[in-house]
């Protein structure tokens, strides 16, 4: 009954919106599992830090489990590098490692979200980066990410149309 109610809500929301973003805490609790169960696709953010990169494998296993057991239509749209400090060797090395380890199977977005004190301040103020610093580098990166995500969405819609015609 709960799953039917969840799917009914999801279907009603899908009629009114092109995209619905569900931002979950970086844990694998029930909220995250329920979000994956309701989702069409997932974008996996990770930081260019050793522990974040290690946690990526665990999250990918969880996504695979949800796909197998609950939501067979779930797909991974990509891995998003966040809080990147491009001038540091560790950011460069871990980003390169993520791309080489996963890039053949899973898209690693071209857009990287840079680390910025302005983003930290926006979060502390309870504002979006666009409301807090719309002309800053983080807002520009998120705008670019939006274009990449829209392109993926358009390709998926075209694929769905082609599948229905067959």
Predicted regions: what is each one?
Residues 1, 52-55, 138:
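Short, conserved glycine- and acidic-residue-centered signature motifs
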Residues 70-166:
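C-terminal lobe/tail of nucleotide-utilizing enzymes
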Residues 14-114:
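Conserved catalytic-core segment of NTP-binding enzymes
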Residues 8-9, 53, 154:
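A periodicity- and composition-biased signal for non-globular, repetitive helical segments
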Residues 1-9:
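Single conserved hydrophobic/aromatic residue that forms the stacking wall/gate
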Residues 6, 59, 142-145:
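Hydrophobic residues within well-ordered alpha-helices
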């Amino acid at each position: 009954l709960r799953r039917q109610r969840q799917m009914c809500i999801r279907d009603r929301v899908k009629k009114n919106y092109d995209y619905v973003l569900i931002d979950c805490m970086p844990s694998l609790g029930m909220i995250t599992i329920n979000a994956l169960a309701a989702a069409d696709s997932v974008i996996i953010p990770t930081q260019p830090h050793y522990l974040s990169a290690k946690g990526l494998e665990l999250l990918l296993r969880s996504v695979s489990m949800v796909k197998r057991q609950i939501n067979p239509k779930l797909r991974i749209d990509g891995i998003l590098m966040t809080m990147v400090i491009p001038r540091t060797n560790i950011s460069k090395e871990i980003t390169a490692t993520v791309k080489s380890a996963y890039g053949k199977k899973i898209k690693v977005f071209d857009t990287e979200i840079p680390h910025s004190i302005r983003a930290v301040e926006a979060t502390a103020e309870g504002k979006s980066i666009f409301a807090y610093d719309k002309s800053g580098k983080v807002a520009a990166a998120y705008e670019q990410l939006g274009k990449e995500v829209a392109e993926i969405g358009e390709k998926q819609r075209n694929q769905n149309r082609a599948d229905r015609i067959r």
